[in-house]
């Protein structure tokens, strides 16, 4: 299980990469959270499947994937993105942003408490996605965060537990120091978990 439904605006449509003579494109999708904030999500798709234009509002179904991208310094950066064939949701989405994904907890951090007393926990979910019309399996490692009582519940879980999660895919910006006086603004993506259950 790996399904996400999004409603938002496409921007910055541009070429991404090419595999077996099939061209792929990428874009930013601007998704309104409903509280005045916006998420900027990475979208990828086959070029021929895109019938939309810049700044057009779309509703789509896809799945959340990860890609380990090599950097010039020899390290790797994990990008989180949504791959879609631009399938349209069967019903009008209740939310602009919702996912349902199952998998295995492969990393589980200690629960944390913020300065204002709120609890949160980070974990990584390993998801095995079987590509449609093929026997190919795609492994993704998805960063997750949960807050409050749900964070306390997850803190009792263990690595290798099989779970199913629901929530929203969010973006957040942060500062990365490149020198003592200079910094760069970076964007990270993570799954905000609002529901979780163990599965056999």
Regions found by a protein language model. Name each.
Residues 1-200:
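Single-stranded nucleic acid-binding surfaces, predominantly the OB-fold ssDNA-binding core
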């Amino acid at each position: 299980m790996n399904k996400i439904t999004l409603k938002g605006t496409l921007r910055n449509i541009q070429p991404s990469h090419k595999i077996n003579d099939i061209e792929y494109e990428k874009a930013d999708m601007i998704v309104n959270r409903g509280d005045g904030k916006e998420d900027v999500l990475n979208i990828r798709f086959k070029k021929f499947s895109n019938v939309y234009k810049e700044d057009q509002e779309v509703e789509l179904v896809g799945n959340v994937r990860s890609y380990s991208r090599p950097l010039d310094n020899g390290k790797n950066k994990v990008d989180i993105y949504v791959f879609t064939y631009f399938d349209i949701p069967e019903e009008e989405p209740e939310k602009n942003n919702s996912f349902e994904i199952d998998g295995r907890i492969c990393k589980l951090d200690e629960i944390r408490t913020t300065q204002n007393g709120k609890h949160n926990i980070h974990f990584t979910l390993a998801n095995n996605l079987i590509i449609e019309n093929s026997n190919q399996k795609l492994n993704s490692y998805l960063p997750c965060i949960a807050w409050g009582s749900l964070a306390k519940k997850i803190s009792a879980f263990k690595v290798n537990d099989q779970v199913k999660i629901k929530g929203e895919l969010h973006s957040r910006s942060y500062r990365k120091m490149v020198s003592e006086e200079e910094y760069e603004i970076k964007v990270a993506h993570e799954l905000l978990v609002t529901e979780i259950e163990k599965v056999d």
